[in-house]
């Protein structure tokens, strides 16, 4: 039977991609349905209990700037907050938080259940309704059919998921979760390229059986960072420490002696695992010269005794896992309460997607999260938000939107995926962005909140907060520009005591702030330049904008040069064999990738500047030389 109500957007899957997609579509006023196999696991942190990190924290801030959920949920659930790379420049500073799994899940569920225009329904999805190359709905296990104008697939590792522990394996979407076998089979019937990937998780340890007195304690930062631009330290629950131990030669011997029982090293697992989050087996074999690896013991929550040993992801048999754990300092008597495992699952080639995350071949069908070959909660959430907003715009026949590489890490993420594809789980790093100085955590709202408001993603309270911050920053910069000091001024001694070279010519507050030995706090502690802003976000923004103004201006010039042909559209169905002058290699690569713009084409390995020139000439001759916004 058909459900009596028709929806604008259906989201299939309630993980980090699905929840952001559902919230985005509903915030934009579309009637949205979230289908999940289990309402109790909405927003579940299936692997490590942490949000953020290098590159990943930038994504979370961007999601937040667009009105998303992840940062706000983390502020309500974070039990330890740190700023990584704090001693480095602002471009690579990143926020990371340990999160209480239960509190995080509760925060996500509460947000979903209180979101207008959003209905949640518990049933596994087994089929899609596709008519004339257009998706029109979904079918659940009990045969109930839902109609919608757009569908977003956010199914994580559940598609034909297979869990491996040693040489044993069984079907599963994650430990304790069923696989989506029927849906996987249905998707394989569609004209989409599909492959397998693998990820893994470590065994969980009972904290009561660890001797923490032998271990190095790792505390959070003071003052404590917040994730959301609307966040406040008062929202944080109790803060607790993590601990550090190390593997050793005994650990490595145990692993080397049991590789014949590893599903990875015996060829049972065929999927490729994440390069930047390798299993402990991989680390020991790939870095044979290392006699130790650092392992972080991360609490799973305030009301749980479970510890997540970050760094020993493994699919070795359980008896070997016990030997590995017991070989490490402080863990000699530790008890494993959940075994580690690897999981293989289907993913679909993201080169078959537009940068809006809509399929190039099935209208109205969007993909987000691990189904696109990424790894990580943050990467999934970012894709979910983008897919959700574009599904909402598709449903109301509005023009789609996605950020460029110079506008957001979300733009870097989708451009990398849709242009280059991936053969291993893709993870975000700051090093993937050409314009890092423009794409900082601190200015994510300045880059994206205005666009989010225009798209209908940003509510009144966030918009008012953003406008107040903008006003504070501009007023403070104007104030500093208007205060001048001269070499013969009476109160010069205080300033010269801070400056490495005494002031030799007149300068205003911004001139002084540009000096490397000066910072905003020091400057505004001087009577002439006081008082300082009370809002830390605005104060940080003033200092960064002033100190890096010249560098930012130069990077902006580079961006403008690069954008001249970036958005020149290419027909998605173009057969490049018909364009004379292109080499066979270039033709093969362009036909394989099917880029949607000259910018995308230029980033494909082997596509030369000469080939780009040929494409531009061909487009001009065909009357197709136009630039999309």
Curated annotation (Swiss-Prot):
Pfam families from the entry? GIDA, GIDA_C_1st, SAM_GIDA_C
**Which residues of this UniProt protein bind FAD?**
13-18
GO BP terms: tRNA methylation; tRNA wobble uridine modification
UniProt keywords, alphabetically: Cytoplasm, FAD, Flavoprotein, NAD, tRNA processing
Tell me which InterPro entries the record gives: FAD/NAD-bd_sf, GIDA_C_N, MnmG, MnmG-rel, MnmG-rel_CS, MnmG_C, MnmG_C_subdom, MnmG_C_subdom_sf
Coiled-coil-forming residues are: none
Per UniProt, subcellular location reads as: Cytoplasm
Q: Which cofactor does it need?
A: FAD
Q: Where do the annotations place NAD(+) binding?
A: 273-287
Top-level taxon of the source organism: Bacteria
The residues forming the signal peptide are none
* tRNA processing is among the record's keywords: yes
Cellular component (GO) terms are: cytosol
Instruction: Give a GO molecular function annotation for the protein.
Output: flavin adenine dinucleotide binding
Among PANTHER family, the record links this protein to: GLUCOSE INHIBITED DIVISION PROTEIN A, PROTEIN MTO1 HOMOLOG, MITOCHONDRIAL
Q: Which NCBIfam families match?
A: mnmG_gidA
Task: Describe its function.
Answer: NAD-binding protein involved in the addition of a carboxymethylaminomethyl (cmnm) group at the wobble position (U34) of certain tRNAs, forming tRNA-cmnm(5)s(2)U34.
Q: How does this chain assemble?
A: Homodimer. Heterotetramer of two MnmE and two MnmG subunits.
Family indicated by similarity: Belongs to the MnmG family.
The protein's name in its UniProt record? tRNA uridine 5-carboxymethylaminomethyl modification enzyme MnmG
UniProt source species: Photorhabdus laumondii subsp. laumondii (strain DSM 15139 / CIP 105565 / TT01)
